[in-house]
Amino acid sequence: HAGDLGNIVAGSDGV
């Protein structure tokens, strides 16, 4: 998810 938890697993950058 884009900006979900900032996890690499979630594929987001935490924004």
Curated annotation (Swiss-Prot):
How is the co-factor bound, per the entry?
Answer: Binds 1 copper ion per subunit.
Q: Name a GO molecular-function annotation.
A: metal ion binding
**Source species, domain of life:** Eukaryota
Catalyses which reaction(s): 2 superoxide + 2 H(+) = H2O2 + O2
Q: What is its EC number?
A: 1.15.1.1
The cofactor named in the record is: Cu cation; Zn(2+)
Q: What Gene Ontology terms describe where this protein resides (cellular component)?
A: chloroplast
Q: What is its main location?
A: plastid
Q: Which UniProt keywords apply?
A: Antioxidant, Chloroplast, Copper, Metal-binding, Oxidoreductase, Plastid, Stress response, Zinc
> Tell me, what does this protein do in biology?
Destroys radicals which are normally produced within the cells and which are toxic to biological systems.
Task: Spell out the family assignment given in the record's similarity comment.
Answer: Belongs to the Cu-Zn superoxide dismutase family.
Under what name is this protein listed? Answer: Probable superoxide dismutase [Cu-Zn], chloroplastic
Originating species: Pinus pinaster
* Taxonomy of the source species: Eukaryota, Viridiplantae, Streptophyta, Embryophyta, Tracheophyta
